[in-house]
Design a protein with these regions (language model features):
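Short N-terminal micro-motifs specific to bacterial/archaeal maturation
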Residues: 39, 102, 118, 146-147, ...
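Extracytoplasmic thiol/disulfide redox context detector
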Residues: 2, 9, 13-89, 151-170, ...
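Charge-dense, low-complexity intrinsically disordered segments
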Residues: 53, 87, 121, 146, ...
Length: 205
């Protein structure tokens, strides 16, 4: 009887230990994800990281503010796709933006801003037409099948998964990231009116 109880105790202990190790590994993995995403690109000490949805009204209002802040402070902006499931054309718009990224990142970002500028008129039926107008204006071909191999969708999905991994709850989500203060590598900007003040504070650290 004692042997049986001992074996039961050992089994439970082993199970708890295994679960603890799995939990620790998951936490470490999540922290690694945060550390890899919320950091400036090589060569920069401070940057703005944005997770956005091209159909999101607040994202439309935030994008030009972020762009102006980038120019004012001469710091880069890193844009991530986070299309929300409740929006009926934002995912395809993100895939289209990724296509223009293949020509140049600047062109892809210009397309994102173009979609924001026309967001109120864009819908699932005319999104392609807006893409064609943009492509023609920039003398770029827009294939009939934009993502034949699925590579562009995979990039959008990877960005969305990154957002989920760092527990994103809304769009836009804007971070000021920095290498200047290891104890506080990123700060979320929760109000657009605080964007410049947050950058100032991070740059002073």
């Amino acid at each position: 009887m004692l042997v049986k109880k001992h074996n039961t105790f050992c089994n439970r202990f082993a199970l708890l230990l295994a679960l603890s190790l799995i939990t620790l590994a998951a936490c470490a993995s999540a922290q690694d994800t945060v550390d890899s995403v919320l950091r400036p690109p090589k060569g920069s000490q401070v940057a703005i990281v944005v997770f956005e949805d091209l159909q999101c009204p607040m994202c439309r209002r935030t994008a030009p503010l972020v762009e102006q802040a980038s120019k004012t402070y001469k710091i880069p902006v890193i844009r991530h796709d986070f299309p929300l499931p409740g929006h009926n054309w934002s995912y395809q718009a993100a895939v289209m933006a990724r296509y223009f990224d293949t020509h140049s990142k600047a062109l892809g970002n210009e397309f994102r801003d173009y979609i924001f500028e026309n967001q109120l008129e864009v819908n699932p039926a005319n999104l392609r037409s807006y893409g064609e107008k943009f492509a023609a204006a920039h003398k770029v071909d827009l294939p009939f099948v934009i993502d034949a191999g699925g590579k562009l969708s995979a990039l959008v999905n990877a960005d969305r998964d990154l957002g989920k991994a760092i527990k994103l709850e809304h769009t836009p989500t804007v971070y000021i990231v920095s290498t200047r203060n290891p104890s506080k590598p990123f700060v979320e900007v929760k109000d657009n009116s605080q964007l410049y003040l947050t950058i100032d504070a991070v740059m002073k650290d």
